[in-house]
Amino acid sequence: MRKYIRESILIVVFSTLSPWLLAQQQFTLYDELPGIYKSYKPACSDDLPGWAKMLYQFPVNMTEISKEFDRYVLLHPTEKSAAIRYYKMWRRALEPCTLPDGTIEMPDAGRFYENLLHDQLEVRKNRETSQVTGSNWTFLGPKETFWLNESGSAIPPSSCPWQANVYSFDVSGSDNNVIYCGTETGYVNKTTNKGLSWQLAGQDYPFGGGVTAIAIHPSDPDVVYVAAGNQVHRTLDGGITWTPMLTTGNLFNADRMKIDPVNPLKILAASSNGVYISADGGLNWSKKWSAPAYDIEIRPNDNSQVFALTSANGKFSLIMSTDGGQTFQVQPGFPSTVVESSGGLLAMTPVNPNTMLAILLSANNTPYLLKGTLTGSAWTWSLQATGLSGSFPMNNGQGYFDLVLDISPVNENIILVGTTTLYKSINGGNTFTAVGGYAGNFNIHPDIQDIEMLPNGETWVSTDGGMNLTTDNFGIQANYSVRVNGLTGSDMWGFDQGWNEDIVVGGRYHNGNTSMADFYQPKALRMGGAESPTGWVLQGKSRHVAFDDLGNGWILPQYAEGKPEGRFIFSKYPNMEEYGGRRSNLVHHPSYYGTLYLGEGTGFWKSSDMGVTWDLLYNFPAKVRYLQISYSNPLVFYADIVGAGLCKSTDGGASWVQKPSLTSPPYGTANWKGKLFLTVSPSDENVIYACLQNGTWSADIGKVFRSSDG
């Protein structure tokens, strides 16, 4: 007989907690800023490394925490955890408002959301008054990523699930051909042919952030609710127009949304700020529970019963409503001793509405799968599986960031659950086998984001790489397919473009390096690599490209299905810092294609043999960022140096003079130093244009300066 969970899991509670832990709060003011999702933040713990403990402090010096993190990663290069994932998101959001000494200037988040709301309403207003202006911009790609044919096989490579990170999606219950999915980069994509092709829904509408939840009306696929940017957005016309539903004084970021199938005007949302409900199609919202909620479920066949997974005092808790979500009470039968580490999820199935599953990410990187059974009017809970075991190998992965759970709507014994790897059970959770990710037979991108099992036997899975479909719950390979054609939302950390050939390369967040070309379209190639802001086109030779995380350079194939034509020595790369927001560049001499310049470390380097060897021309006191060369006089260079700002050379880089006016009032400020983007007139070496990179939070956003005297 299976023992109840409170007898199966031994929780040791120390009577004396560390002074550090007692002094910490889960969230700081940083966690309230746009681009940071509080639900992904793991629980405060003594076991966290030093840099991770700093995430619970305020204020924090960016330089100090970055150094600590970088040292840690050198010692643990392959580690994945909720803390690492949260830090990367936290750092990316805060770097634009970091001063040279590492001080983080708190931006005005309220003004940001006010401006965002204004822009959202303006898009709708302009569309309604036919004031949307046309443009010559078209989508270049990646339109559909394919595997690189490294072996030269006669069989063309297949589509590759390494394209865009899809946080969430929903399949229309009234028409399974219609699906809406949302990306980490804030795009909503729509398909009407079951993912064979995707189109943007709301191309001109700024959703304001990653799309964390989507819910489609149960009988009308044109009515859709999307959670993104601390807002709930609604469309009534299939994604042509969108409306923000929350006022600036009542914003929240929903991680899960459910529409009542009996009363579709009722929408329930679980968020880091609690449980919210709307009874009028999203026009008005009220908070029904104040503690963070990770998931919400409406009991199949009884819409009066609503369940939400939440936490209290560092432990998981299940709350239940018997009046359709108007009021909630703590469910007494749910175990109250499971330590909450990084969130959890619930799952129910219409084939047996008296059963519920909960996956709880607990201490020591260990998830627990619980099973609830309704007997009479009481729910009883038992431990179904313990992670990091032979029968259930799953760990906590990256926490709530990549966590899924679902039960088949036609067979309660089929369960899919995952974090970085997806696992499947066909015996009700007694044993699990890996499906795909870091283990398993299916080539699914690691880091599972969302899942939906349908009554027709189809299962959709979204990952950091895109959308995946199986028609037999991952039974055989022939019934599995990648569905990323036209899926928009790749996060291009790196970018470079050819001159003589229309080649574009770049490193992508989550999805490695890609190569695109006019002679590959509509295909893009997966080149490999991880998450580097890299990618450089060598202009003088056909199809020669280089990526810092792939070793030597590549000679790309002549056509998308072809074999790469070889490798070549390329021994030095520009400074490239994570997220692509601060990187140097590769500069070509305008007259000699084999002569290259770049900034690596504090050095200004020159190669006369197309990157095989390099000579140090000058050593600056700090890192070299953006570079430019004058086409009209190739002896003239401009460089942006960390802590120094704009510098100029008139002798080919042998000597440099600081040009302080740009980074001094009344123009820019000292904060601009090391953050410049600049270009030089092709006809006049003394005419340059400059702006601030990543100036979203700055009062200098949108400012472009021109100098006509060098």
Locations of the language-model features?
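Bacterial Sec-dependent N-terminal signal peptides
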Residues: 1-30
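Beta-propeller blade termini and top-face loops
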Residues: 29-710
